[in-house]
Design a protein with these regions (language model features):
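N-terminal leader segment of winged-helix/HTH proteins
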Residues: 1-56
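C-terminal regulatory/oligomerization modules of transcriptional regulators
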Residues: 1-24, 148-176
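Alpha-helical linker/hinge and terminal dimerization helices associated
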Residues: 42, 129-145, 158, 162-170
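Helix-turn-helix DNA-binding helix
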Residues: 92-93
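Basic amphipathic alpha-helical segments that dock to polyanions
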Residues: 66, 81, 96-103
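Charged, amphipathic alpha-helical coiled-coil/dimerization segments
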Residues: 98-153
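N-terminal helix-turn-helix DNA-binding core of bacterial DNA-binding proteins
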Residues: 47-88
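Pre-recognition alpha-helix immediately N-terminal to the DNA-recognition helix
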Residues: 34, 45, 64-67, 125
Length: 176
């Protein structure tokens, strides 16, 4: 006698907490589970990709800070980095900046009274190698899914919009 095959429709939604899915918008719990999975996978990817690019021992935030400092080849302040990366705890970005400085990937400067960070040649080269590894390992597999670049951009826009809703809900929860 063979066992009946299970399908996702017979099992229900894929969530991490059924008690959260038992509400007005169960799909939100599915989304949150997916966000948790992709968040952790993306952080692992950044760390491993940068290590493969020749710069081991960086955290995911270190990698993000380095990429943003290299972005558009303009010096950035800690406040700029915190705003763009949506990091509330300034000390985390400050620590990442010091670590990247000690590795020679960024250099400190000044804009008026504010400290700035600019990419060094070593930092730009590390980001270039990261891009090469990304193009070799990640880009082809994502392209092979058949998801169009337009659809990926659409998903990115939805995620950015949802981040605003989560931020507003966090502010409301903090005032309770």
């Amino acid at each position: 006698m063979s066992e009946p095959k299970l399908s996702t429709s017979s099992l229900g939604s894929i969530v991490s907490s059924a008690h959260l899915a038992d509400g007005a918008l169960p799909a939100l719990s599915e989304l949150e589970f997916g966000l948790n999975m992709i968040s952790h996978a993306y952080q692992r990817w950044m760390i491993r990709c940068m290590a493969a690019a020749g710069v081991p021992d960086l955290s995911a935030l270190d990698v993000l800070v380095l990429h943003h400092v290299v972005h558009r080849q303009r010096p950035k302040t800690i406040a700029d980095l915190c705003l763009v990366l949506d990091v509330e705890d300034t000390h985390l970005v400050t620590y990442a900046a010091k670590k990247l400085q000690s590795l020679g990937l960024v250099a400190a400067g000044r804009r008026g009274k504010e400290k700035t960070l600019a990419a060094t040649e070593a930092g730009r080269k590390a980001c270039g190698r990261y891009r090469e590894v990304r193009e070799a390992l990640l880009t082809p597999t994502v392209a092979a899914t058949g998801i169009s670049p337009e659809k990926l951009s659409e998903v990115a826009a939805v995620l950015r919009a949802l981040s605003g809703h989560y931020d507003q809900a966090a502010r409301a929860a903090a005032s309770l």
